[in-house]
Structure formats: C-alpha cells, structure tokens
Regions:
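Positively charged n-region of N-terminal signal peptides that target proteins for export
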Residues: 1-5
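Bacterial N-terminal signal peptides
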Residues: 6-16
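Domain-scale detector for complete catalytic domains at protein termini or as standalone homologs
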Residues: 13-15, 21, 29-32, 36, ...
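Short, helix-capping/interhelical loops that line the mouth of catalytic, cofactor-
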Residues: 18-30, 81-139, 162-165, 191-197
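Second-shell loop/turn segments in exported
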Residues: 25-32, 53-70, 123-134, 167-171
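N-terminal targeting signals for Sec/Tat export/insertion, comprising classic cleavable signal peptides
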Residues: 28-56, 179
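Short, contiguous alpha-helical
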Residues: 55-104, 146, 150-197
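Amphipathic alpha-helical packing segments from all-alpha helical-bundle domains
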Residues: 139-147
Length: 197
C-alpha cells in the first residue's frame, strides 16, 4: 500500500499560508500529491476483493465497500461541478477564507465526527458494479489532475460558492473527502465479520 508521502503532505499543508494569486509551486505540488495519494489508496483498498467482501455491511444500514466507491463516483462530479461554477466567477481580491488548509486535510482523517450525505449522493445502484464506479471515479480524477497541474487561475482569490473556503481549499476538500471514505473502507475491512475471501 502506497502511504509514504502522506506525512509530507500533512507537514507541508501545516506550513502553508493562503495567498491570493495562481497556485505557488508548493501549493500545486501538495494538491497533486494528495490527489495521487487518495486515488492510489482507493485502488489498493478495493483490489482483488471478492463479491462477498465488496458487499459486506457492518450493520444493515451501513455502507458496503462497493457502496462507498459508488458514493465517491456520484459525489465527486457534483463537487467538481461546484468547483467549476465558482471558477467561472471573477476573483474577489478582498475575500479572506475563514478556515485553513489544515482543516480541509483533517476532514479526511478525523472519522470521530460523522456526517450524513445529501440524498443526491446516496448510492442506489447508479452503477452496475464496483469496477464501473471506480472507472468513473478515475476518469474524473484525470480531469482534476490536469487542472491541478496546468491551471493558472487564481484559486485563492475566489470564494467557493457562499462558503468560508477559498477555491484552492475546496479542491483540497474533494481529495480529502475521498480520504475520509478510504478510512471508512478500512473500517469495514477491519470488522470481525468481514469475509476472509
């Protein structure tokens, strides 16, 4: 499992400060690294799982691994559309975010605070199987990665919709949201009832 650069991402995010203008080399590197990390981790967690393992639920109302991946394939396009809506608006030089990059990262790590997703992001067989969900996730991630590598837009100077984050922080949040659900998959796989094969 590829985890080596997670501490580096965390450290450099802790050291960063929000500055208006195009992404700095450090900001770009951190964003790319986090996107790469979460995509690689997700693939690692679901690789070679059987149907029984993919469909196991810890409780009748909890999500299976397959449903978690489906949720990501449903949710990330919605979050990305919101990103693009905000990007289409002109920068706001006076906008100051009321949160930090670290808070965006911590959202993916801290599973003690549980939330309920919106109805439009609940997995309900929107994809025929896990492979289809994962393929859709990866296709959108390729678009995100291209933006992360090439964009010269001012993400710091743009507010995400009406929220307290700047647009760079929302980009981080999308990847951090995946991290959060990767942690959820690990919880499912660590459950005593999880099938051995």
């Amino acid at each position: 499992m590829r985890i080596a650069f997670a501490p580096v991402v965390a450290f450099t995010l802790l050291a960063s400060a929000a500055v208006a203008g195009p992404m700095t080399p450090g900001e770009r590197q951190r964003l790319i690294a986090h996107l790469e990390m979460t995509e690689a981790w997700l693939e690692d967690e679901v690789r070679n799982l059987s149907d029984a393992q993919l469909n196991f639920k810890m409780t009748p109302t909890s999500w299976s691994v397959e449903e978690v991946v489906m949720h990501l394939a449903i949710a990330e396009p919605q979050y990305w559309d919101q990103f693009k809506q905000s990007l289409a608006k002109p920068p706001q030089p006076d906008f100051k975010p009321q949160t930090t990059d670290v808070a965006m990262l911590w959202y993916g790590i801290d599973r003690t605070q549980r939330t309920t997703t919106g109805e439009a992001r609940v997995p309900r067989d929107q994809f025929p199987d896990m492979k289809s969900s994962l393929a859709s996730f990866k296709k959108l991630r390729a678009e995100m990665m291209k933006t992360a590598k090439e964009s010269q837009e001012d993400l710091r100077g743009r507010q995400f919709l009406t929220a307290s984050q700047d647009l760079y922080q929302w980009f981080l949040m999308i990847s951090s949201h995946s991290h959060r659900h990767i942690m959820q998959i690990r919880e499912v796989k660590a459950h005593k009832g999880f099938p051995k094969k």
